[in-house]
């Protein structure tokens, strides 16, 4: 399926993504089983979290927007990023929970670039998540125009 697409279009894919795909091809069944066990533990922890809280609110990204000429962040607060995707790990890591998540703009950096939050709710609570997001959007009332 996608392996065929990768083989036929490899020269058109960004080199970092090619490396990710090639690493994926080398993952063993045992490693996948271990990863699924870790993910199961994550589900249990998230479930416990939502016994006490209705929502998890966190930044959409670990860093402020950066120059368009910079392909990716190499360091955050003095800590080196091991891969080109570490700087937005908080964005994709939450998707591993299978919980509904929404991102909202909430303001602008000191240089005028947009910043946001993501809100996560327990599984199958999309209606509550959307209602809560609407309340936040109304309270924050970020200027609807683009800063660029």
Residue spans of the language-model regions?
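Short helix-loop capping/hinge segments that flank enzyme active sites or metal/cofactor-binding pockets
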Residues: 1-43, 47, 63-64, 103-106, ...
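Short, basic, helix/turn surface patches
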Residues: 1-13, 85-88, 125-138
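Tryptophan-centric aromatic hotspots in well-structured domains and transmembrane helices
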Residues: 19, 43, 72, 87-88
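Structural helix-boundary/capping segments
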Residues: 26-27, 32-33, 44, 52, ...
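Short, surface-exposed loop/helix-turn segments at secondary-structure junctions
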Residues: 34, 66-87
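Structured helix-beta-strand junction loops
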Residues: 38, 52-53
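Short, solvent-exposed amphipathic alpha-helical segments in soluble enzyme
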Residues: 41, 73-75, 134-135
